[in-house]
From Swiss-Prot:
HAMAP family hit by this protein: IlvD
Gene: ilvD
Protein name: Dihydroxy-acid dehydratase
Record lineage: Bacteria, Bacillati, Bacillota, Bacilli, Bacillales
Binding site for Mg(2+): D80, D122, K123, E446
Organism of provenance: Macrococcus caseolyticus (strain JCSC5402)
Keyword list, A-Z: 2Fe-2S, Amino-acid biosynthesis, Branched-chain amino acid biosynthesis, Iron, Iron-sulfur, Lyase, Magnesium, Metal-binding
Amino acid sequence: MRSNMIKKGPEQAPARSLLHATGQIKSPEDMNKPFIAICNSYIDIVPGHVHLRELADIAKEAIREAGGIPFEFNTIGVDDGIAMGHIGMRYSLPSREIIADAAETVINAHWFDGVFYIPNCDKITPGMLLAAVRTNVPAIFCSGGPMKAGLSATGKALTLSSMFEAVGAFKEGTLTKEDFLDMEQNACPTCGSCAGMFTANSMNCLMEVLGLALPFNGTALAVSKERRALIRESAFKLMDLVKRDIKPKDIVTKEAIDDAFALDMAMGGSTNTVLHTLALANEAGIDYDLERINEIAEKTPYLSKIAPSSSYSMHDVHTAGGVPAIINELMKREGILHPDRMTVTGDTLRDNNAAYTIQNEEVIHTLDNPYSEHGGLSMLHGNIAPLGGVIKVGGVDPSIQTFTGAAICFDSHDAAVAAIDNHTVRPGHVVVIRYEGPKGGPGMPEMLAPTSSIVGRGLGKEVALITDGRFSGATRGIAVGHISPEAAALGPIALIEDGDMVTIDLVHRTLNVDVTDDELKQRKARLQPFKAKVKSGYLARYTALVTSANTGGVMQIPEHLL
């Protein structure tokens, strides 16, 4: 056992004394059992995490029953919805790296034999995922689960995205104060991750197809008995993984990354999943070509349209068969998934999901009746985005296949929001928000406020937005993010000028500005070098080390320092 490093031999007597002092060692025999870390993320200010202390207690009890000794520790968490639209959002993506580093530190410092990860919301799941692959200790994930969908006084289904769009409608005068306050009180009725196919739920669903979590991890409600049963079952499965020495890198292969993107396409997941899955590939040492994502989109049908792209919530998906039913449906067509891969159950992806079928074909469509023959996400390339940009095509009105408009440029999120609110942005514009990438932001903040304001003002089909920042999973409309290289890295998005004609072509997956190469070269020669916005603290260190979105926005030490 790994943990023998801290508990065996006369040299470790001081360590054993300290271990006895924790209260977790109940008898001398416990020193012969596997030490299991519970990497929790309980925090009071994040509704998706307020109940995780209870779930960790269930996991600890089950681990003891299964013959292990549990030790719980906690990571930080940022609520993207609360941090939205101010400096707090600049800490959101960087928090992923802190979580990964913190988990790595505790796991490796104490030589745990296995790790039970309990994440839920946006950056916590991917942060723990990076730690799991980096430490490569037998591990399992069981998230906290989604919240119930809200319900307005008029009976309208609500999610957090409804609330963000309501802000624009209220400012526009098309929503009364009474209805606005009613929505505010009822949009988030329980604990759990937000009820739509936003980043948290997207990532927790992907954990199932990656093979690191049990079926229904992504959809069983936070408040359900099923969630608690899933925690218990996951604990017993983890102990089996420890005995069999099955590690995350045995499960996270290039084929697993492919399958994660395929499920993402089938469910129209958040664009943030692209960022996090590329970061996972990087951490696992997997060379992953971005063009592979479009190849997967070409062969993967869009089967389940979930809020904000429809009124269906994660609970609706769960009762319709959940992720297992979607996986089983995709397995019916040869070549979409790699169903014979190893998973944390010790069985294959096929074995885990073959028994589940679609229970409601309105919520989860069949292969014979997809929303689209192609996936809900696309990578775009062109002279604005030589290294790519991403759009959630499932959140774009199907009538829009191309959009050409005049650029209106902003060097910050706040300037763009002000221009949208004061009606400077008008139909036919392509809003360009730059210097908001990983380095430029810093922290690649989400552009949910401007996209929600555009949709809330009724301009969702008449105004497009492109950015080197990113979007919330709650974003919909003609919105291209993750443009790489970012402006702070002298990317071409920095060269666009007001009035330039920009074309977004969803059919050919291109993003171009109608400016000659010679003119772009001249503009680049005049471009001033980027100066870091933050000079001290964590964000200053992050700015110095972070890469653009095409590599997952990971932190890398310059080669000359290695």
